[in-house]
Amino acid sequence: MKAIIFDAFGTLFKVTSGGSAKTIMKNIADCGIVVDEKTFLEEWKSYYKNHTLGNCAFMPERDIFIARIQMFYDRYHVNGNAEKDADFLLAGAFEREAYPETKTVLDELMKNHLVFIGSNTDNDVLERVMAKNGITVHKVYTSENLKCYKPTSQFFTQILDDNGLSAHEVLFVGDSITDDILGPKAIGMKTTWIDRNGSGGHFGQDYTITDLNGLIKGVLR
């Protein structure tokens, strides 16, 4: 295996989900407006998917976030500042911590492999999180600099083309079944699912690990 591409958030760095949507929903509810939580959360997710799966013109994540908040504010006639609220909520992303084994494993793998990060994120977010945690790799690819999102094939093929690699020479490691397993698998990459919660299941991945140490102790041994 010549190269290993890692997803960033949920794979190398800790992440929480769902808080932003509920905060915006609360902002609306605080104006005395009744909001159906299930419907709101479903549409919150579908808006992101529609703007990342090639159904719309490319937008950086921050712009998607602002537009999504503004859409809900307009619908419910809330006089909120979508850009300000988006930046407030996104500020937490800059503080994400690396998993305990991340730096050690990456440093070890870089001795014998090309190590890249391939993440659905904006450049400034990933750059700051990497700097905060002292993480370095050979190259970093984001949805912002590739102008597309996982799991679209263009995301992965651009990385291959940029490095003169064939799909069978690359291992993709990540926690998302759709983005990090089905996406790269579709173009012929080997895949490793990081199942930190031990939930189990087989979705076409070649390997399953519970933390990054499993790459050194098992997958690449």
PLM ranges: what are they?
Residues 1-4, 14, 80, 103, ...:
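Asp-based, Mg2+/Mn2+-dependent phosphohydrolase catalytic module
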Residues 2-100:
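N-terminal helical cap/lid subdomain that shapes the substrate entry/recognition surface
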Residues 111-112:
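Structured helix-beta-strand junction loops
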